[in-house]
Amino acid sequence: MKIDPNKEKALAAVLGQIEKQFGKGSIMKLGEDRSMDVETISTGSLSLDVALGAGGLPMGRIVEIYGPESSGKTTLTLEVIAAAQREGKVCAFIDAEHALDPVYARKLGVDIDNLLCSQPDTGEQALEICDALTRSGAVDVIIVDSVAALVPKAEIEGEIGDSHVGLAARMMSQAMRKLAGNLKQSNTLLIFINQIRMKIGVMFGNPETTTGGNALKFYASVRLDIRRTGAIKEGDEVVGNETRVKVVKNKIAAPFRQADFQILYGQGINRTGELVDLGVLHKLIEKSGAWYSYKGDKIGQGRANATKFLAENTEIAAEIEKTLREMLLSHSSSSGSADEVEGDENIDFETGEVF
């Protein structure tokens, strides 16, 4: 496209002025001198990494993970921390619920000796700690557990029964405006865990909503809805959960994909089970009757034995995972993305409250 010479000179002058005032890189052409690929961190689940389209959760962005109680929200975030620490990244956990179990975290592969942990007294304190860690540029992943536990200072200092309408929503709205830019500059991933509430008086449509107003919904680049879909049993004993995660919002790839995987009690996500299932689905692992084979060699009779074989032979498991990632992620990325579809609601954009 040919640009008028006078406009070109004026544009060059104003770009130079902006860069001089705000620093190099403060404004540029979209396709110029920047990587179009988004840096990501694995979720610990290959199926979910593929569903996200980019191979994991995006750095420099806000992510919301929500679902019912005991659905696997904290487990998923601990898996993200473990994956990030394996890459040498620094992680922090803001435990607003005061419920983090270090023994369980260690079982999932988290290096708790190098995990920063804070148990703030108020919501404002938690968000200020988040902002300070972000601005330092030294922390790569921050988890906030949970939005529902971020209680405003005024509510804590008040009496039980006092009305505090919109306080939490206003606090979150102010925090999002402040955090979003800092996260991008420091390339920090901020994950909020959230709980589900029921809208009162809803006759049609989904009555479920999340706490903290709507500001987080707008600022989040990725929103994950995690649900427990069944139980995993060994005989009469329940040893884990069948879990489904739906990507309800995705600004880095196509949304509305879903992933199914298993969470085993005391172990976390069943990665080798995923490798067996995905390997068979994509013809990487052969299944003949009850026998599973890889490259002509039998690896086990029945899914449980094949899973056990891969758990004991980590080199073969790593080879299968690498092949599956190359195969699936090259096809899963999309040229466009869409935000989640919201209902026709009147929204106070300051507090995020629906009225």
From Swiss-Prot:
What GO molecular function terms would the record report?
A: ATP binding; ATP hydrolysis activity; ATP-dependent DNA damage sensor activity; damaged DNA binding; single-stranded DNA binding
Q: Where in the cell is it found?
A: Cytoplasm
- Gene Ontology annotations of biological process type: DNA recombination; DNA repair; SOS response
Q: One GO term of the cellular component aspect? A: cytosol
Tell me, what's a Pfam family for it? RecA
Presence of the UniProt keyword Lipid metabolism in the record: no
Keywords, alphabetical: ATP-binding, Cytoplasm, DNA damage, DNA recombination, DNA repair, DNA-binding, Nucleotide-binding, SOS response
The record, for PROSITE patterns, names: RECA_1, RECA_2, RECA_3
Residues bound to ATP: G67, P68, E69, S70, S71, G72, K73, T74
Q: Does the keyword Cytoplasm apply?
A: yes
Q: Which SMART domains match?
A: AAA
Q: List the CDD domains hit by this protein, alphabetically.
A: RecA
Q: Which HAMAP family does the record associate with it?
A: RecA (MF_00268)
Q: Which family does it belong to?
A: Belongs to the RecA family.
Protein known as = Protein RecA
Q: Which organism is it from?
A: Shewanella amazonensis (strain ATCC BAA-1098 / SB2B)
The coding gene here is: recA
